[in-house]
Amino acid sequence: YMGLLEIVKNENNDLNKINSLKKFCEVELGKGAIICNDTPGFLGNRIGVYAMQVAMTEAFKMKLSIEEADAVFGRPMGIPKTGVFGLYDLIGIDLMADVLKSFIKELSDKDEFQIVAKEIPLVKKLIDTGYTGRKGKGGFYRMNKSGDQKILEAINLETGDYSICLLYTSDAADEQQR
């Protein structure tokens, strides 16, 4: 499912064995294997979660809708087509909160991650009420079943209320900027 595989090494590892493992993972498993030092958080999480948290924080500051934020901070920034908020829903809002807490605890107070790893009240409210993403009642997006219809709804970051989701593309976001 995921293309990236991180092999964590330390000073006690035999580098020949590490390199053999890397080659096996690339050739036999088809993974993009990288060798990392043992530090808090996987490399993918250090980069990806940081970028997602910055995007989320900026969306709140800029008073964007989640649809606008996902169009702007999604594909154009290398995030999957779900966009940032959709990706939070896919991963699990509660799991992302746990990852953030882990980083806050394990990383130095001077680490740049600490600046953006603050708890967001709406995120806490979503988790507390069972809106943990796709595995729960919904998250930033939810599917509202009305009779035979399924209506995709998006949460308003300011009010916490849901309304019918407006789909934006990065082209549409560019147009709105003009």
Task: Enumerate the predicted regions with their spans.
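Glycine-rich phosphate/pyrophosphate-binding loop
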Residues: S146-S170
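Rossmann-like dinucleotide-binding core of oxidoreductases
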Residues: R46, A51-A71
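Interdomain hinge/lid region at the active-site interface
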Residues: A71, R75-K150
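Single conserved hydrophobic/aromatic residue that forms the stacking wall/gate
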Residues: Y168-R178
